[in-house]
Amino acid sequence: MKLSMPRFDQAPVLVVGDVMLDRYWHGATSRISPEAPVPVVRVEQHEDRPGGAANVALNIAALGAQALLVGVTGRDEAADSLANSLKAAGVDARFQRIDSQPTIVKLRVMSRHQQLLRVDFEEPFRTDAAALALDVEALLDQVKVLVLSDYGKGALQNHQVLIQAARARNIPVLADPKGKDFAIYRGASLITPNLSEFETIVGRCADEAELVAKGQALMSELELGALLVTRGEHGMTLLRHGQPALHLPARAREVFDVTGAGDTVISTLAAALAAGEELPSAVGLANLAAGIVVGKLGTAAISAPELRRAVQREQGSERGVLGLEQLLLAIEDARAHGEKIVFTNGCFDILHAGHVTYLEQARAQGDRLIVGVNDDASVTRLKGAGRPINSVDRRMAVLAGLGAVDWVVSFAEDTPERLLEQVRPDVLVKGGDYGVEQVVGAQIVKAYGGEVRVLGLVENSSTTAIVEKIRQKG
């Protein structure tokens, strides 16, 4: 599946549901309590993070999309903490505050990255469903997708009113369902149960074929547009009417904590759909996002750069021939990992041993080597009629096959100055017997603090000489 990064800045999403505060107490554990056989934790740090529907909205904002949130809280310190965190993250939160009930808080006691205890402070909210529906309807014209983030805590009382209001405006409705009655989500564009939630409704599935059959039946019964079953280490399965099932393998490299993974899936889906992605592509992006977030500790959001890097890995753009946009993203990823970027350029019309030795020496100047290649028209201007011998596509393909070369990109100008201004390498390398100041682009690189290095030429290695020898023998 071909994936690309959507324009999340053009993706307004409204999230409605059960907001909660995820509170973490971190501390050291070195002894057992004399009062009971339990560890004593000396609390050294505490942090609050938005949870539930608030985490969905936070994830949407972290991707660079516009997140609006409607939910229910108490009128207390936890609600204030939630509101402040969401505002700082760029989420437009509208809370229905209830004096008589506390904000839902999930307190986790942590030591050495392990969860020792979770304490829940909650009671189901007695929501003013009519007032909440009015708040939602007032915002629907501002968004492209509606998300129902349902944790069964009472914020969502009349799902059908919200679903029908969105459908009347041709706004897709995504629901993360809970409970034993999925009929309340009838008419939704997509629901995203995990496997356990799905099997609670349809019964145990012995294999994928049975999962698909039961899923298709559920879609028809509830008039759903699509169904996405998240299956942990087995990935995800997307079902659509009249289409074959789409099975996506899990993409997690390491799994530390699955807390909030479902929130990440539906938030990425919503943001991608709001940005104009087709459903299969949006699911592919959500699958990558889930693989990232389970590698983090606790309730966490992923950023657009993190997802962008995952897309690059998925599309194999860690190495090889890249367009300029892809290259700039790959450089951003490399710099995020502290890697030094080296750049060199040339025509590389007929690759020979001298080129290979030179490129290996250039690669040794840093961590990543970019080779800028003159396109065919510029080679003709520089070398004369009859050149290049090989087209730019072939020249770049050969260079990309060398172990020393990370990325290859072409440029149309006679010199690489314009490309250097965009790439901004840490080190500019050229081969020759001249001084640093004579290197084309040296002033550009040195102006922003980069280095320029000149490597010696390999003797008896010249493309021009090779071409002349071929012509003499031809």
UniProtKB/Swiss-Prot annotation:
Enzyme class label: transferase
Reaction it catalyzes: D-glycero-beta-D-manno-heptose 7-phosphate + ATP = D-glycero-beta-D-manno-heptose 1,7-bisphosphate + ADP + H(+); D-glycero-beta-D-manno-heptose 1-phosphate + ATP + H(+) = ADP-D-glycero-beta-D-manno-heptose + diphosphate
GO CC annotation: cytosol
Annotated residues for binding of ATP: 194-197
Pfam families attached to this UniProt entry: CTP_transf_like, PfkB
Keywords attached to this entry: ATP-binding, Carbohydrate metabolism, Kinase, Multifunctional enzyme, Nucleotide-binding, Nucleotidyltransferase, Transferase
Region named Cytidylyltransferase: 343-474
GO biological processes: ADP-L-glycero-beta-D-manno-heptose biosynthetic process
Cited InterPro entries: Bifunc_HldE (IPR023030), Carboh/pur_kinase_PfkB_CS (IPR002173), Cyt_trans-like (IPR004821), PfkB_dom (IPR011611), RfaE_dom_I (IPR011913), RfaE_dom_II (IPR011914), Ribokinase-like (IPR029056), Rossmann-like_a/b/a_fold (IPR014729)
Molecular functions per Gene Ontology: ATP binding; heptose 7-phosphate kinase activity; heptose-1-phosphate adenylyltransferase activity; phosphotransferase activity, alcohol group as acceptor
Region (Ribokinase): 1-318
EC number(s) given by UniProt: 2.7.1.167, 2.7.7.70
Pathway entry: Nucleotide-sugar biosynthesis; ADP-L-glycero-beta-D-manno-heptose biosynthesis; ADP-L-glycero-beta-D-manno-heptose from D-glycero-beta-D-manno-heptose 7-phosphate: step 1/4; Nucleotide-sugar biosynthesis; ADP-L-glycero-beta-D-manno-heptose biosynthesis; ADP-L-glycero-beta-D-manno-heptose from D-glycero-beta-D-manno-heptose 7-phosphate: step 3/4
SUPFAM superfamilies xrefs: Nucleotidylyl transferase, Ribokinase-like
Top-level division of the source organism's lineage: Bacteria
Active-site residues from the entry: 263
Signal sequence range: none
Subunit-structure text: Homodimer.
Protein role: Catalyzes the ADP transfer from ATP to D-glycero-beta-D-manno-heptose 1-phosphate, yielding ADP-D-glycero-beta-D-manno-heptose.
Family: In the N-terminal section; belongs to the carbohydrate kinase PfkB family.
Protein name: Bifunctional protein HldE
Protein's organism: Pseudomonas paraeruginosa (strain DSM 24068 / PA7) (Pseudomonas aeruginosa (strain PA7))
Originating gene: hldE
